[in-house]
């Protein structure tokens, strides 16, 4: 028997809105430690890594590990039925069951909605994610990254990210011209942590990425006030959003090779 209860159904709704345009279906791997999801987009350029730890749920019960293969499009539609303040309970009987149940309850418990989604068989691929010693780690307001991607996508399709101790520069060029946006580390100690930019740089790094993917990642902005970009030459950038005390949503994007 698997059952997990979230105080905010809106959290899972925001997660699905962030990934459903990249991946059509995926396995939610449930274990006593929590729920995880790893999935590659159709072009094999982006890897999604979602971790929701058991201690972040109001209640969490998982007798044994099981995988719930779900259509993310269908799940996203059902989650839209949840009110912003509703709680969410997820139930699955065992590996023999072909459905998973989602229950939404209003704060006053005067409205309860339950939906069953049929499970689908998805080949379960596990990707090895190695911890790297990155050349540059940039922590910045997530809304700022979203704005940068939105502004620069008007001009070009490939963004060059250059990072060093002095700042991080986002550059694009296209048929109509070029553009650059530079973000410097926050020096004012009075700026709240969730509004400050912090750059840890061991050595300068310059990488090119498809802007459309970075723009897609920023759909996760409502999940967290901050985003972390971890970069090193020749390996995927990691764009990570911390989800309160529940876990994190990370995107790995391979650089464009000229």
Swiss-Prot record:
Subunit and interaction comment: Homotrimer. Forms a complex with activator 1 heteropentamer in the presence of ATP.
DNA-binding is among the record's keywords: yes
Protein name: Proliferating cell nuclear antigen
Subcellular location: Nucleus
Gene field: pcna
Alphabetic keyword roster: DNA replication, DNA-binding, Nucleus
Family per record: Belongs to the PCNA family.
Chain segments annotated as coiled-coil in the UniProt record: none
Function noted in UniProt: This protein is an auxiliary protein of DNA polymerase delta and is involved in the control of eukaryotic DNA replication by increasing the polymerase's processibility during elongation of the leading strand.
Pfam name, any one: PCNA_N
One of the protein's GO biological processes: mismatch repair
Database matches in CDD domains: PCNA
DNA-binding region: 61-80
Gene3D superfamilies cross-referenced by the UniProt entry: 3.70.10.10
Example of a GO cellular component annotation carried by this entry: PCNA complex
InterPro entries: DNA_clamp_sf, Pr_cel_nuc_antig, Pr_cel_nuc_antig_C, Pr_cel_nuc_antig_N
Organism of origin: Dictyostelium discoideum
MF (Gene Ontology): DNA binding; DNA polymerase processivity factor activity
């Amino acid at each position: 028997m698997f059952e997990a209860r979230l105080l905010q159904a809106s959290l899972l709704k925001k997660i699905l809105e962030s990934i459903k345009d990249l991946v059509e279906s995926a396995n939610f791997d449930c274990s006593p430690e929590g729920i995880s999801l790893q999935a590659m987009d159709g072009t094999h350029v982006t890897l999604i890594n979602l971790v929701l730890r058991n201690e972040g749920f109001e209640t969490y019960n998982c007798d044994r590990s099981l995988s719930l293969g779900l259509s993310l499009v269908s799940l996203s539609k059902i989650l839209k039925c949840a009110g912003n303040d509703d709680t969410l309970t997820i139930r699955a009987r065992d590996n023999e069951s072909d459905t998973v149940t989602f229950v939404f309850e209003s704060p006053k418990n005067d409205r309860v909605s339950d939906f069953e989604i049929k499970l689908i068989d998805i080949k379960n691929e596990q990707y090895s994610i190695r911890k790297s010693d990155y050349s540059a780690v940039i922590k910045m307001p997530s809304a700022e990254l979203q704005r940068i991607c939105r502004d620069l996508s008007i001009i070009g399709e490939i963004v060059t990210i250059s990072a060093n101790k002095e700042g991080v520069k986002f550059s694009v060029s296209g048929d109509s011209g070029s553009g650059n946006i530079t973000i410097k580390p926050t020096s004012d100690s009075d700026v709240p942590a969730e509004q400050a930019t912090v750059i840890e740089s061991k050595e300068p790094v310059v990488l090119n990425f498809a802007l459309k993917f970075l723009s897609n990642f920023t759909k996760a902005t409502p999940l967290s006030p901050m985003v972390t970009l971890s970069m090193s030459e020749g390996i995927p950038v990691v764009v990570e959003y911390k989800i309160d005390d529940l876990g994190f949503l990370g995107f790995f994007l391979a650089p464009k090779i000229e």
